[in-house]
């Protein structure tokens, strides 16, 4: 008897393929599945089911560092949401955006033939690395798993980078490489996190999923997550935790600001500021928050 053992990853793909209709779309995850696999998100969604964290929350997350996001995620049990070790092109203000995922695998002719046939049925134009750009909307960050390939693993050059920025007004993350860096550097505010750069063109790969769960190094990434880039690396925040990350970080910053002000004014000692605050201190702090127009408050202890 011949026994065949399937890996968990292969089993997952087979389940999706067998559950899909006869003319399955390339993305493999349906709208209902994107909703099913993000059950804790109760807010708005894109037409394809991807969670849509509000722009107002995205703006607040631009002040968040990897360390600050890490604390909230760890407390919530999310221990695989950070990945470091990137080369950054056009570093500037922090990269923040709603994740659109894409996954590539080494090319296998029989599978790639089916993928291209399905692409034609879906009226997709150009090479497979351009298909993923067509679905981007303002505020999106394209996150591509290209299995760390550098030589012949260049997902974009300056032309497709221009197209990405025109659609999303945001950046790119690729566990692979890019080319035409001189041209990419001429695209203002287009921030790229990449594993490397190479002059070769993209070859011998195939696009096997759009807006499906992917792995970026040690991080598990879902469509609709919020990508936050800073000098330490990339943090992928589940949508249901995005506002809490923003709230907790804002509170930390405001506590520091008020504490420094109290020390400069001589109203409290360093020991008082660094220890458990009294009820009177909390009341004064909350009154100061109200005066600043902040909506968050410190609860009484």
Label each region the model flagged:
Residues 1-3:
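N-terminal hydrophobic targeting signals that begin at the initiator methionine
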Residues 5-19:
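Bacterial N-terminal signal peptides
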Residues 20-24:
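Sec/Tat signal peptide C-region and signal peptidase I cleavage site
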Residues 25-70:
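N-terminal pre-domain segments of enzymes
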Residues 49, 164, 225-227:
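Buried hydrophobic positions in well-ordered alpha/beta secondary-structure cores of metabolic enzymes
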Residues 50, 232-234:
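Structural motif
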Residues 60-68, 72-223, 236-301:
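Feature captures the catalytic cores and cofactor-binding loops of soluble hydro-lyases/lyases
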């Amino acid at each position: 008897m011949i026994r065949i053992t399937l890996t968990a990853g292969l089993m997952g793909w087979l389940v999706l393929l067998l559950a899909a209709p006869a003319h399955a779309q390339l993305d493999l995850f349906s709208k209902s599945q994107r909703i099913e696999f993000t059950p804790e998100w109760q807010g708005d969604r894109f037409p394809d089911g991807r969670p849509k964290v509000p722009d107002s929350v995205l703006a607040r997350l631009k002040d968040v560092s990897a360390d600050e996001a890490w604390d909230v995620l760890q407390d919530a049990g999310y221990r695989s949401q950070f990945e470091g070790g990137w080369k950054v092109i056009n570093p500037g203000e922090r990269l923040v955006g709603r994740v659109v995922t894409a996954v590539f695998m080494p090319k296998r002719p029989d599978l790639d033939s089916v993928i291209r046939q399905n692409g034609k049925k879906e009226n997709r134009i150009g090479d497979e690395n351009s298909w993923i750009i067509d679905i981007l909307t303002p505020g999106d960050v394209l996150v591509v798993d290209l299995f760390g390939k550098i030589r012949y693993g260049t997902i974009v050059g300056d032309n497709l980078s221009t197209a990405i920025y025109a659609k999303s007004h945001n950046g790119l993350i690729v566990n692979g490489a890019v080319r035409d860096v001189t041209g990419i550097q001429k695209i203002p505010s287009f921030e790229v996190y990449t594993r490397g750069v190479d002059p070769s063109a993209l070859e011998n790969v195939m696009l096997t999923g759009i807006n499906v769960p992917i792995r970026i190094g040690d991080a598990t990434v879902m469509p609709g997550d919020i990508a936050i880039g800073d000098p330490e690396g990339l943090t992928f925040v589940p949508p249901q935790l995005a506002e809490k990350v923003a709230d907790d970080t804002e509170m930390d910053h405001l506590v520091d600001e008020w504490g420094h002000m109290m020390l400069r004014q001589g109203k409290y000692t360093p020991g008082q500021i660094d220890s458990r605050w009294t009820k009177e201190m909390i009341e004064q702090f909350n009154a100061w928050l109200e005066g600043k127009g902040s909506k968050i408050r410190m609860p009484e202890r």
